[in-house]
């Protein structure tokens, strides 16, 4: 007798997910999933709820309606934060620490074992030679690159990237796409929000379009 094939559950799945603010709907209900090795590009105009969606998934906002599953199991808020790496509009860096000190501090803060040494991560994002530079001395684009280095050090399988192309030049945009592609090849997944035309999605990319609530 031939045994039936067992397909792995999605890395992340959302069922009837919805969010409201002051009784006004922000998004949803939404049903979507992301498999290992896949990126989901979340598009929509400003006010469509892209940032809010990522914050809900990351556990920064409470799930009001619907369900979030990780590997086929309902995920509690704390479980999601350990499973996901979130890159938001603000880099969340310590302005009076150096770039290298920031990476060491953040790795220790989250109790995570870095998958590469912080110095190597700086080189990957084009900040080699800036190890001792204070964050407050960096440009907006350099701060974004430092935030990308922190992301690269995270062992989290799912990346939540909110407008990762903002404040980056063409080289920076190419860097983001390369990082996403490498993460997917390693078995990770990514949700990427954008409302511009900068994104050149890597392989195995699907689209989710959000519309602003009427």
UniProtKB/Swiss-Prot annotation:
The gene is ccmA. ATP binds at residues 44-51. GO terms for biological process: cytochrome complex assembly. NCBIfam families: ccmA (TIGR01189), PRK13538.1 (NF010061). Its EC number is 7.6.2.5. It is an enzyme of class 7 (translocase). This is Cytochrome c biogenesis ATP-binding export protein CcmA. Keywords: ATP-binding, Cell inner membrane, Cell membrane, Cytochrome c-type biogenesis, Membrane, Nucleotide-binding, Translocase, Transport. Coiled coil: none annotated. Belongs to the ABC transporter superfamily. CcmA exporter (TC 3.A.1.107) family.
């Amino acid at each position: 007798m031939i045994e039936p094939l067992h397909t792995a559950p999605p890395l992340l799945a959302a069922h009837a997910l919805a969010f409201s603010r002051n009784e006004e709907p922000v998004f949803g209900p939404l049903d979507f999933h992301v498999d290992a090795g896949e990126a989901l590009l979340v598009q929509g105009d400003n006010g469509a709820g892209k940032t809010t969606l990522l914050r809900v998934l990351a556990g920064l906002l409470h799930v009001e309606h619907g369900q979030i599953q990780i590997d086929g199991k309902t995920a509690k808020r704390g479980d999601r934060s350990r499973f996901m790496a979130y890159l938001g509009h603000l880099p969340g860096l310590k302005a009076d620490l150096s770039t290298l000190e920031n990476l060491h501090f953040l790795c220790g803060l989250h109790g995570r074992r870095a998958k590469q040494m912080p110095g190597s991560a700086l080189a990957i994002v084009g900040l080699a030679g800036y190890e001792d530079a204070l964050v407050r001395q960096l440009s907006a684009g350099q701060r974004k690159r430092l935030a990308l280095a922190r992301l690269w050090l995270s062992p989290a399988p799912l990346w939540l990237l909110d407008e990762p192309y903002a404040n980056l030049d063409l080289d920076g945009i190419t860097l983001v796409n390369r990082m996403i592609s490498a993460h997917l090849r390693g078995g990770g997944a990514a949700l990427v929000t954008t409302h511009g035309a900068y994104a050149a999605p890597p392989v195995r990319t699907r689209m989710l379009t959000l519309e602003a609530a009427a």
